[in-house]
Design a protein with these regions (language model features):
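Thiamine diphosphate
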Residues: 7, 52, 92-94, 100-102, ...
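Short, ordered loop/turn segments at secondary-structure junctions
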Residues: 1, 26-27, 86-87, 249-252
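Active-site diphosphate/adenylate-binding microenvironment
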Residues: 10, 14, 132-215
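Glycine-rich, anion-gripping cofactor-binding loops and their flanking helix/strand elements
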Residues: 1-82, 185-216, 228-232
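Phosphate- and divalent-cation-binding pockets in alpha/beta enzyme and binding domains
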Residues: 5-9, 67-69, 111, 156, ...
Length: 253
């Protein structure tokens, strides 16, 4: 996402404002997904979008607010929008911004923080934390049978995988659930084909990530159908002597 390098600054902004954070798929990990105010990948869930519809102000940092981020075409936004983007053409793209701030996400948020003081009361903070807990409770209660199966595997995977692991995911059911039900500690640890939702990218992306960062664990999450698109690239991985755990979700694809 456009705020991937602004994690420290955005985290400070969240603490200053005491606001709920709903990340897009590409924004997963910009703030640690375990932060009590974060709903990771929440834009794909109706429960989080319902909360967005009730907000009087939306601060959108480095996001295109694209259709592929929410699955419904348009966010149900009724409040004002303050939008931060490095591309001035995006400030009013799809949604009219009440305030547009053109600039790099990291530097712009840093300037916002300089103007803010942490004036959030403990009572306000608890109220916001409880709102996040309730949204997550609703999400969990509304999981489909398939999503519950995914959750079991993802929970185990999160426990055993090192925190620094990069997960290269394909367009498959397992990773769709992982978008909102798999916590990532920092940006660029969850690679997903958000733009065109293309099949077959997980393995090639993982090979590239492992070659760029040979000491960092990299794992592949892919469906059986998507894996067939780029299975020959296993030869490339072998030629480079890469260690790449591949988790294939078999669902008749």
């Amino acid at each position: 996402g456009g705020s991937s390098d602004a994690g420290k600054e955005v985290s400070k902004l969240v603490d200053n404002l005491g606001a709920v954070v709903i990340t897009t798929t590409a924004g997963k990990g910009v703030i640690n997904d375990n932060h009590p105010l974060v709903i990771s990948g929440g834009t794909v869930r109706a429960e989080a979008r319902e909360y967005i519809s009730k907000a009087d102000l939306i601060l959108a940092v480095g996001t295109e607010m694209a259709e592929t981020d929410n699955y419904v075409g348009k966010y149900p936004i009724n409040g004002k929008i303050v939008r931060v983007d490095i591309d001035e053409k995006k400030i009013n793209d799809n949604y009219q911004a009440s305030v547009g701030l053109v600039g790099d996400a990291k530097e712009t948020v840093k300037k916002l923080n300089a103007k803010l003081n942490n004036s959030v009361s403990l009572e306000q903070l608890e109220s916001v934390k409880n709102a996040v807990i309730e949204i997550k409770r609703k999400i969990d209660a509304n999981l489909t049978k398939s999503e519950k199966r995914h959750k079991k595997l993802l929970t185990i995977l999160r426990k055993i995988a090192p925190s620094e692991t990069i997960f290269s995911t394909d367009a498959c059911q397992l990773s769709y659930t992982g978008v909102f039900d798999f916590n990532i500690p920092e940006a660029r640890k969850w690679l997903h084909p958000v733009g065109f939702c293309a099949l077959g990218n997980a393995l090639p992306n993982a090979i590239g990530a492992k070659m760029a960062l040979p000491t960092t664990p990299v794992a592949v999450l892919v469906g059986d159908g998507g894996f067939m698109f780029s299975m020959p690239e296993l030869l490339s991985a072998k030629e480079q002597n890469l260690s790449l755990p591949i988790i294939i979700w078999e669902n008749g694809g």
